[in-house]
């Protein structure tokens, strides 16, 4: 990875982590104040990768966010021989470097959607950006879905009018449970292997994707912060969370990439919900 590219992308992911954690802690504070509770805070844990690099896992378990994790990492080394053929540009020597941020939020309220987001920059003998964000409501609402998609469409349209329809389609295709023949949530955008030939433009786009998430998801959470919910709704949420687990363990590229590169297991599996039911 080019040193300057590595530094500026890694610094951005760290900055975005701080912005997201600050906003989520603020939401916890807003809720706690009305209930005379002590607001939850993120707990950070650093980890080192044996083959090179490491990361920081930020985890919060609160009254609003039952479990929310924000991970940043910068790792480098060599892919195992059996994994090299799956990664563009790694076929010859297997060398790679990757930096990125990943976020998964599971809310206590079954009325507030779960959310997944990540962006990353990877170099082998080639280089590219990837990432996106998607929403998983248990009780979908059309206006909420439209608002989420509109935020990402605005970010996409600044760069290419073809980005949003392309990345939306890729998201719908990627977050699909083939064995159940059903989607995981209401989508968003998903892009990978993005290299337009203009690093600055691709990096700027990836930054705007992060800011789009920061602008829209906290608004969705706040809109339902104090809505009452029933035991039946909670039960349904726990059952539907099972689909989330199935996808992440069977299909998720990030999970596979992390495990195949000897990443931190706790950080990799942070995406799993804290409580789930299988019927």
Swiss-Prot record:
Q: What class of enzyme is it?
A: oxidoreductase
Catalyses which reaction(s):
coproporphyrinogen III + O2 + 2 H(+) = protoporphyrinogen IX + 2 CO2 + 2 H2O
Positions annotated as active site in the UniProt record: 116
User: What is the recorded function of this protein according to its Swiss-Prot or TrEMBL entry?
Assistant: Involved in the heme biosynthesis. Catalyzes the aerobic oxidative decarboxylation of propionate groups of rings A and B of coproporphyrinogen-III to yield the vinyl groups in protoporphyrinogen-IX.
What does this protein need as cofactor?
a divalent metal cation
Please provide the record's keywords in A-Z order.
Cytoplasm, Heme biosynthesis, Metal-binding, Oxidoreductase, Porphyrin biosynthesis
Major place of residence: cytoplasm
Assembly behavior: Homodimer.
Q: Where is this site: Important for dimerization?
A: 179
Q: Which GO terms describe its biological process?
A: protoporphyrinogen IX biosynthetic process
What's its EC?
1.3.3.3
Family annotation (InterPro entries) = Coprogen_oxidase_aer, Coprogen_oxidase_aer_sf, Coprogen_oxidase_CS
| One GO MF term attached to the UniProt entry | metal ion binding
Which Gene3D superfamilies does this chain map to? Coproporphyrinogen III oxidase, aerobic
The Swiss-Prot or TrEMBL record describes its family as follows:
Belongs to the aerobic coproporphyrinogen-III oxidase family.
Q: Cellular location of this protein?
A: Cytoplasm
Q: Which organism is it from?
A: Rickettsia akari (strain Hartford)
Protein name (Swiss-Prot/TrEMBL) = Oxygen-dependent coproporphyrinogen-III oxidase
